[in-house]
Design a protein with these regions (language model features):
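Short conserved segment of the HATPase_c
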Residues: 82-104
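Residues immediately C-terminal
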Residues: 53-54, 81-82, 515-516
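Conserved short strand/loop->alpha-helix "switch" segment adjacent to the catalytic nucleotide/phosphoryl-transfer site
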Residues: 26-45
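GHKL-family ATPase ATP-binding module
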Residues: 1-14, 21, 45, 53-55, ...
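C-terminal interaction appendages of subunits in large macromolecular complexes
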Residues: 390-409, 424-429, 440, 444-446, ...
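Conserved, non-catalytic sequence blocks in retroelement Pol enzymes and Pol-derived host proteins
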Residues: 85-90, 291, 322, 469
Length: 646
């Protein structure tokens, strides 16, 4: 950040209050997206974003996040401290304005903050409104100030409670149980993922996460310290840790073009996937936007120019496409924009046109320098591009074959599909069932009006290790495309999934509750993530939860999904109940499968969502890729959460 910003006076005059808070408690989803798990965690992100803004302005380098024993959260930074002097317009302390007025804060004042994070931009006041209790403590000008709030309303005026040599702001809040009715339990892993991401995006900042709900064997609380010296370069290494690189270095740069700071880091690996993650002011822009457009333009033009000059493309009999330059690419783009305009379905697509050219120029300069200085790597990249073009040509033919077999192409449905009679896709669901025998039981137990069954023969192809044309040639995968009625464009610019003719709005993976079943579920999820991501993002993918046990005594019976439920059911029946352990779906008869796993009134379905594309990509490449040590480490760390049937 510039020295000019650091020198500016950050006081009550810097705080602008835009509107009142009346709406927040009535319509919380308008402000934080939802009141489920995602919205609950978003409260933490809003408070942390304030501290990150202080860091971006050059006034803070340490942030602490603590999950307390009662699931309240404390966020502390060593910034300047929120101003506490009287706000001229509002007539109360600036701290109270920040905490009780939506949109109030220095981030709307360009002199105090050049750029600011926070997707919704609602700030800590929204967190305050949605909290049962919040306490703000400010360390500023040698004094300690405090104010507490209940459901967004101050309990007393800001008061001085002591003196100090430190500076910064500490906010402790407890979410309101009348608003967050689904859960108040914070996920350590979810918060850790976001804090790690923020540390990579803002190098030099130290973010500490502590979970006081869990104590380690040595007596310390569970926790991690996130600090990155190399920023995006380190981020790429972290994401690509389970893939084999084909070039010697991560290519990276930091640039400021036309007052738009641009950071890029990229590497090529042996995989066939393109993984580009884009950020604006620390917000993950899932839907891309103008910064991604600029990156692709700069990358394609520069590599095409080099490849043409090298003469390596002369023997190729067809045109190179933009996609060919991005196969096996992992890249991160981060830009800072003063007034970002967000578009798209989830408001995570950058719309600022002025961003395209600076990003494109910065990427072009970075790549030109690297290719010139590293001729061996340059040749390897071009050879990778040629192989990608040849594979794309073969995959296009395979995709066209899939298109001809889909309903859109006039072909028939897969012979193994037992369809439903309902014609409205919104009311229809299809079960992807492991094995023909379980598929037979599911066909007998289903409600034929709205439930379809597609049996899958054994383990489907591991798409993480397969070239794209091999994926489209696989019969089981072609059957899934055909049954769902979805298509992938055969032209390279329109490879996005077309969900307009999706035949079922619920796609349910139903596998055995054992290790093999989990493996098959993971293979199917990997396929969906790599080739039908829109299906997951649209909320259409679910995993069925068949029970592990039947507990029976006389005429009484209960199903149990874990050991605790099994033991409680046995106790309720007076002990000595007969316990049957289901090793597979085939062990249940049609009636049992219906009442436990398929009846909408009683079944449990787990909806598959993606909180972080970058983290999901890393986990899928680790679980399904070639590198064994990271996979072993992940399994050992998470084995405690798994039920393994020996």
């Amino acid at each position: 950040m510039s020295d000019e910003i650091k020198k500016n006076n950050y006081s009550a005059d810097s705080i602008q209050a835009l509107e009142g808070m009346e709406h927040v408690r009535m319509r919380p989803s308008m402000y934080i997206g939802d009141t489920g798990v995602r919205g609950l965690h978003h409260l933490v992100y809003e408070v942390v974003d304030n501290s990150i803004d202080e860091a971006l302005a050059g006034h803070c380098d340490t942030i602490s996040v603590i999950i307390n024993e009662d699931n309240s959260v404390t966020v502390e930074d060593n910034g300047r401290g929120i101003p506490v002097d009287i706000h001229k317009k509002e007539g109360v302390s600036a701290l109270e304005v920040v905490m009780t007025k939506i949109g109030a804060g220095g981030k709307f004042d360009k002199d105090s903050y050049k750029v600011s994070g926070g997707l919704h931009g609602v700030g800590v006041s929204c967190v305050n409104a949605l909290s049962d209790h919040l306490r703000a403590t400010v360390f500023r000008d040698g004094k300690i100030y405090e104010q507490e709030y209940e459901r967004g309303k101050s309990m007393y005026p800001v008061k001085q409670i002591g003196e100090t040599t430190k500076r910064g702001t500490t906010v402790t809040f407890k979410p309101d149980s009348t608003i967050f009715t689904q859960t108040l339990e914070y996920s350590y892993d979810t918060l850790a993922g976001r804090m790690r991401e923020l540390s990579f995006l803002n190098k030099g900042i130290t973010i500490t996460l502590t979970d006081r709900r869990h104590t380690k064997d040595n007596g310390d609380f569970e926790g991690e310290v996130f600090h990155s010296k190399e920023g995006l370069k380190e981020f790429v290494k972290f994401l690509d840790g389970n893939r084999v690189p084909i070039i010697s270095h991560v290519i990276s740069m930091e640039h400021e073009k036309g007052e738009i700071p641009v950071e890029v880091a990229l590497i090529y690996n042996e995989s066939y996937a393109e993984n580009i993650f884009s950020y604006v002011n620390n917000i993950n822009t899932h839907e891309g936007g103008t910064h991604l457009q600029g990156f692709r333009m700069g990358l394609t033009r520069t590599l095409k120019k080099y490849a043409d000059a090298s003469g390596l493309l002369e023997k190729l009999k067809f045109e190179i496409s933009g996609d060919d330059f991005r196969e096996g690419l992992t890249a991160i783009i981060s830009v800072k924009v003063q007034e970002p305009q967000f578009e798209g379905q989830t408001k995570t697509k950058l719309g600022n046109r002025e961003v395209v050219s600076p990003v494109s120029q910065a990427v072009a300069e970075m790549l030109e320098n690297y290719l010139e200085e590293n001729p061996n790597d340059a040749k390897i990249i071009v050879q990778k591009v040629i192989l990608a073009a040849q594979a794309r040509h073969a995959a296009k033919k395979a995709r066209e074959m899939v298109q001809r077999k889909t309903v859109l192409g006039g072909g028939g449905l897969p012979g193994k599909l037992s369809d439903c009679s309902e014609q409205d896709p919104a009311k229809c669901e299809v079960y992807l069932v492991e094995g023909d025998s379980a598929g037979g039981t599911a066909k007998q137990g289903r409600d034929r009006n709205f439930q379809a069954i597609l049996p899958l023969r054994g383990k489907i192809l591991n798409v993480e290790k397969a070239m794209h044309h091999k994926v489209f040639e696989n019969e089981e995968i072609r059957n899934i495309f055909t049954a769902l009625g979805v298509t992938i464009g055969t032209e390279e610019d329109s490879k996005a999934l077309n969900l307009e003719k999706l035949r079922y709005h619920k796609v349910i993976i139903m596998c055995d509750a054992d290790v093999d079943g989990s493996h098959i579920s993971t293979l199917i999820l990997t396929f969906f993530f790599r080739f039908m991501k829109e299906l997951i993002e649209g909320g259409h993918v679910y995993i069925a939860a068949p029970p592990l046990y039947l507990v029976k005594k006389g005429n009484k019976k209960e199903y149990a999904w874990n050991d605790d439920q099994r033991d409680l059911a046995n106790e309720r029946m007076g002990g000595s109940a007969a316990i049957q352990r289901y090793k597979g779906l085939g062990e249940m008869n049609a009636e049992q499968l219906w009442e436990t796993t398929m009846d909408p009134e009683f079944r449990t379905l787990r909806q598959v969502t993606i909180d972080s594309l970058a983290e999901a990509d890393r986990v899928f490449s680790m679980l399904m890729g070639d590198e064994v040590p990271p996979r072993r480490e992940f399994i050992e760390k998470n084995a405690v959460y798994a039920k393994i049937d020996a």
